Amino acid sequence: MANEKYVIGPLGEQHNRAAFRCADHHITNYFRRHALVNMQSRIANVWVLHDPNADRVIGFYTLSTASVDFDAVPPELTARLPRYPLPVVLLGRMGVDRRYEGQGFGRWLVVNALMRVYRQDVMAAYAMIVDPKEGVRDFYLNKFGFVPLVNNPNRLFLHLQTFIDTLASDTRAE
């Protein structure tokens, strides 16, 4: 599990992208060939969790801006919302190197992404959305409480305040 020996920060030239290999070859290819260019072009912010002692990238995720139509938001979350598109952050891509699978790093990366979006003060974001790959949809639904959008059930949505409230109640329960 992630601890003080691991570091998370923006992707840079110094990170060993060539050694990264996750279970999904599309994600591996994206990280090796396109992530740095996307970061430099400001298409997406790419955050990497790495072990500086081993010169290994453990995992990464991308964040970019997006919007969701009001009508797509689950009705139970629409009270007091404006009737126009809502600003959200897209958790676009995420991967964990095969050597680190099954150790809780995927969950740690999602929590880090949610906390990063919640704490930032540069732009407003009401929620996070994700388009999960086949086989990981339940991870977002069950572990974090994401819900399907009304008009696109393949795209999942999590109100940031819901995440913070859940995190606070989990902390109090410990």
Please place each PLM-identified region on the residue numbering.
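Short glycine/proline-centered loop/turn elements that form peptide/ligand docking sites
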Residues: V110, E134-V136, P153-L160
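Short amphipathic alpha-helix that is part of the acyltransferase structural core
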Residues: M1-S41, N53-R56
